From Swiss-Prot:
It comes from Thermococcus onnurineus (strain NA1). Keywords: Methyltransferase, S-adenosyl-L-methionine, Transferase. InterPro entries: 4pyrrol_Mease, 4pyrrol_Methylase_sf, 4pyrrole_Mease_sub1, 4pyrrole_Mease_sub2, Dphthn_synthase. S-adenosyl-L-methionine binds at residues 10, 87, 90, 115-116, 166, 209, 234. S-adenosyl-L-methionine-dependent methyltransferase that catalyzes the trimethylation of the amino group of the modified target histidine residue in translation elongation factor 2 (EF-2), to form an intermediate called diphthine. The three successive methylation reactions represent the second step of diphthamide biosynthesis. The lineage of its organism: Archaea, Methanobacteriati, Methanobacteriota, Thermococci, Thermococcales. This is Diphthine synthase. It holds the Pfam family TP_methylase.
Amino acid sequence: MAIYFIGLGLYDEKDITLKGLETARKCDLVFAEFYTSLLAGTTLDKIEELIGKPIRRLSREEVELQFERIVLSEAKGKDVAFLTAGDPMVATTHSDLRIRAKEMGIESYVIHAPSIYSAIAITGLQVYKFGKSATVAYPEKNWFPTSHYDVIRENKERGLHTMLFLDIKADQNRYMTANEAMEILLQVEEMKGEGVFTPDTLVVVLARAGSLNPTLKAGYVRDMLNEDFGRQPHVMVVPGRLHIVEAEYLVTFAGAPRKILDEV
């Protein structure tokens, strides 16, 4: 008996691979979590209808603190599927879950699916030029994270692009927009004053990756702050040093100002 970590892809229930679908249908029990990412184009009911089985949705607490009791205990005697948005091994949490399964002597298998790490190529930015990614988190009382700012600075110094994931608080139904992320980064800029993220910084926003009509826009922060990017999820990129083809792509497909062509 085993646990199968199955990716659901980026947007709706049709993004799961045939291998993932066939495996989920064969499993005795199916669990899922949606707090690490969002499938904006579908619902749990639609996924259940496609798979033909009931799915137990787990909370963050159940995944991180009770996974052994709820899921792995079942995998000792049954085949269990664990569904996640995107690719299952992109989230560090899921890597930890697989380690726990190994420690309990339970076989585990990974079935990949489309991920933002591949879909980000629709921006026209060359994938091999991306540096370390970071998450822009919602500030809280007595806690204002700034590590994402430092990551942008470090990548810029090396000419690399920075992909920024935007905070998700699924239990509160809060999904950060690119506009909110820009506001937060401008606040950090005021605090640090290093010129890393200013109104003149070029940013690229991708919304609803994986859908038939994703939104792709590029421009300077001062012009993008009030843009309507539509429904979440959003992801944002702060480009490093652009190649001429990257710049032309952003102008052609993301509406970037032609001025960037003179800056490469």
